[in-house]
From Swiss-Prot:
Protein name (database record): Cathelicidin antimicrobial peptide
Pfam families named in the record: CAP18_C, Cathelicidins
Transmembrane segments: none
A GO term from the CC aspect: vesicle
GO terms assigned for molecular function: lipopolysaccharide binding
Annotated spans, Cathelin-like domain (CLD): 31-131
């Protein structure tokens, strides 16, 4: 009497299961994140560590620098995040939240790794980019006022010399 053990199909199934078992961990370990995916994970980490009331969402990601092919090597990143309307206490993805009007904007720099198994990042963010924006607005307004004043002075000088020029009557 012939049993299933004696048949060739058991050997094939055993080999198939062995190969499947060996390749599955490699697929999980070897997953390489895209540059943007790694940054989004870093933003999630920042939200978890943050003591602010609301979640932050990626606002702008600076262009990807040229990188080597090793996903374990830390890659430099630079991006801005903006405060959303979602409280940090809810379990929601920041991408599902709207930006808060006049919300806090933070500029962040650091490094991320693209290897999902390592999933490491070292990011630091400035406290308030709005102060820089306000200073820029003040400087722009001051420049406009100074420019307007110089334009008036220039017109007066032009008028003065225009009056001094000899006039010829016809």
């Amino acid at each position: 009497m012939k049993t299933q053990r004696d048949g060739p199909s058991l050997g094939r199934w055993s080999l198939l299961l062995l190969l499947l078992g060996l390749t599955m961990p490699l697929a999980v370990i070897g997953r390489v994140l895209s540059y943007q995916e790694a940054v989004l994970r870093a933003v999630d980490g920042l939200n978890q560590r943050s003591s602010d009331a609301n979640l932050y969402r990626l606002l702008n990601l600076d262009p990807r620098p040229t990188m080597d092919g090793d996903p374990d090597t830390p890659k430099p990143v630079s991006f801005t995040v903006k405060e959303t309307v979602c409280p940090r206490t809810i379990q929601r993805s920041p991408e599902e939240c709207d930006f808060k009007e006049d919300g806090l904007v933070k500029w962040c720099v650091g490094t991320v790794t693209l290897n999902q198994a390592k999933d490491s990042f070292d990011i630091s963010c400035d406290k308030d980019k709005r102060k820089v924006a306000r200073l820029g607005g003040i400087l722009r307004k001051a420049g406009e006022k100074i420019g307007g004043g110089l334009k008036k002075i220039g017109q007066k000088i032009k008028d003065f010399f225009g009056k001094l020029a000899p006039r010829t009557e016809s």
